[in-house]
Amino acid sequence: MRLLATLAAATAALAALTLPAHADPGPLGEAGGTLALPLKDAVKVLPAAQETRVGYTRTSFKHWTDADNDGCNTRKEVLLAEAFIAPEQGARCALSGGEWYSPYDDVYVDAAGGLDVDHMVPLAEAWDSGAGAWSAQEREAYANDLGDDRALIAVTARSNRSKADQDPATWLPPAESYRCQYLSDWVAVKMRWQLTVDDAERQALTDRVAGCPNEPVRVTFAR
């Protein structure tokens, strides 16, 4: 599936990079630039800030758009990309049949209606972590990010709604075998969009990746 392919591609050799000594490393790079770090170092360089949800509504992020005007919105594009048995595609991108795997809870799903497409870093969490200061266009780009396979993932509605807007300090996927992958993907999305972490989130990430393979996290900055 898309996420596994992306992580496999990230095992290429990394250039040496000296980590900053101060607590808040600041911006990680320019839009279009790249950065690759071992997972545990990637956690260290995420910018630090306290969270704020003042002014947030879900409509602050225009999502499920059809950027390429092919009749399939972002949700449908993810479902088509992640199906391991392709669904039939009808008028207006109506999907029937097909089969998917939900890694959050280790469940196979044979109907698109049983799936949610989850933002790896939820919209509310993104707002808390800096997106509240972005332009409407940047928030729309974030909510429909098909440029990185880790940003959006098809999972069971039940597991997605259990997660809601929580970060890894309070929620991890029920499937323990997927947790290290989940943490790596979470960090990658935060890096890609240069989203901040608060103290509790960084501590939780640090503690939880301690038992994970220290594999590289490679991103292209979206902003």
Residue ranges of each PLM-predicted region?
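N-terminal module-boundary/linker segments of secreted carbohydrate-active enzymes
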Residues: 21-69, 201-203, 210-223
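Glycine-rich, flexible loop/turn motifs
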Residues: 52, 68, 74-75, 113, ...
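Short, motif-level signal for alpha-helix interfacial/capping segments enriched in acidic residues
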Residues: 45-46, 91-106
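N-terminal carbohydrate-binding/catalytic regions of secreted carbohydrate-active enzymes
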Residues: 54-96
